[in-house]
């Protein structure tokens, strides 16, 4: 199944739009930028992962939304406990990292992954 944007989930607090395609693409491009692998390899890694599986409800979306795309990318490539292998647990320069995410999203016309309404 192809992941797509515009998935709407409702719960008692309101609704969330999960742009799953954009989220997956952002993680792929972070793998390319931060790890230095090809887009093809990054795509295979992401598409085999839980990031690309169908999401059932708002609760699952909420769980995803607590993970930084950086964290998802590093976890997928380096595995659990990647921070024990000398990989920073989170971006060392958060401003630079946010600028990188923004640049990727603009360049590839990606949507904000999570929109709570």
What are these regions (language model features)?
Residues 1-117:
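C-terminal alpha-helical interaction appendages
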């Amino acid at each position: 199944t192809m992941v797509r944007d515009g998935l709407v989930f409702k719960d008692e607090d309101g609704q969330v739009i999960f742009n799953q395609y954009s989220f997956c693409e952002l993680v792929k491009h972070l793998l390319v930028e931060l790890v230095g692998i090809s887009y093809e390899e990054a795509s295979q890694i992401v598409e085999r992962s839980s990031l690309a599986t169908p999401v059932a409800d708002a609760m699952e979306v909420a769980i995803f939304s607590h993970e930084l795309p950086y964290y998802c990318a590093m976890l997928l490539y380096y595995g659990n406990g990647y921070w024990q292998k000398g990989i920073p647990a989170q971006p060392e320069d958060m401003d630079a990292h946010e600028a990188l995410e923004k640049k990727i999203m603009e360049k590839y016309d990606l949507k904000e992954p999570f929109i709570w309404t």
